[in-house]
Structure formats: C-alpha cells, structure tokens
Design a protein with these regions (language model features):
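Aromatic-lined carbohydrate-binding/catalytic grooves of carbohydrate-active enzymes
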Residues: 1-24
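Mature extracytoplasmic enzyme cores
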Residues: 17-171
Length: 171
C-alpha cells in the first residue's frame, strides 16, 4: 500500500509534492516493480487524515452547526443583527434556521422575517422567549500530517460536490 504522509524532518530538500509529475513517475516505478515481482499494489487517495487538500476550497470544507441563542422577556425584540458571533466564521457561516420558542414551547419560524443584512423584523414577544439561530459554518480543520503538496482544508464528507472536487484530481 502506498499511503503518502508528511515528510521526514531533515529531508525537506528531498520532498516530492503529492501527485506532481515526479511523484507520479515514482508511483509508476513502484507499480511496475511490484508487478514484475508478482505483487499487487494499492494506493490510498488521502494524504494524512482526514481527506482533504489544496483542491478543497472553503465552500467544500468540513461543515459544522453553530447555534446562537437570544433570550427575550415579554415586550422585547432581538435588537442586534442575526449574524454569527465567532469572528473566524464571519463571512463564511450561513444562517439556516431561525426559530422562536415561547414559554409553552410553541415554535415560530422567523426565517422569512430576516433581511439580507441579518436584521430581524419581528413584533415584540408576549412572554419569555428564546430565539435559536442555526448557522452552517466550517470547521476550518486542515489535513493533519499531510504529505508535501497535500496540505489544505478537510473536505465535507457528506457533500457530493466536495467529494467530487476531492476525487477530481485522481481522474
């Protein structure tokens, strides 16, 4: 099995970037030598853990749920714009759901009341209410112990487009 991982310290001048022409030449040599010896050969399509790399852009990177809660008393509204608080997620995370729950557990979907700037056009609540904002954010995790040339974001393993983007470099 050929599994490309991080390079050995002290041998940086001998690193060969993953899937570069030189790397492919070396893989070809390994494969043909194995065949001559009557051996099979397998190659892992990952470098390090988990799968990802330079071809994975932010849109296809591993995703996570971010939940923010706004607690309101009777007569109040959410005054601030509904935006993700984490500075690392600003400009990345996308609001997916906005739901208010009153004291009795009744739910009200507020998504249609949020404008493009995140301003919420709502009436004051009549009882204690909790508003939950659910954002689709990114883990921003990078491939750990990536082979030279394999560094980059971890892919969203549940996304067809991310998987297609990842596998495209092998076709």
């Amino acid at each position: 099995e050929v599994t490309p991982i991080y390079g050995a310290v002290g041998f940086e001048s001998r690193y060969v970037d993953f899937l570069s022409p030189k790397w492919m030449e070396m893989l070809n040599y390994t494969s043909s030598t194995a065949a001559k010896l009557g051996m099979g050969m397998d190659m892992n399509t990952g470098t390090g853990w988990p799968f990802g790399g330079p071809q994975i852009k932010t849109a296809d990177a591993a995703t996570k749920l971010i939940v923010q809660t706004y607690k309101l008393n009777a007569g109040e509204i959410v005054k601030e714009a509904i935006r993700v608080n984490d500075p690392k997620q600003q400009g990345i995370a996308v609001l997916q759901a906005l739901v208010a729950y009153d004291e009795k557990g009744n739910a009200t979907d507020l998504m249609s009341k949020v404008d493009a700037a995140g301003n919420l056009n709502m009436q004051p609540v009549t009882s204690k209410t909790e508003v939950y904002a659910a954002f689709s954010g990114k883990t921003l995790q990078k491939v750990k112990r990536a082979a030279p040339g394999g560094e980059g974001f971890t892919l969203d393993h549940l996304s067809k487009s991310a998987t297609d983007a990842y596998l495209a470099r092998f076709t």
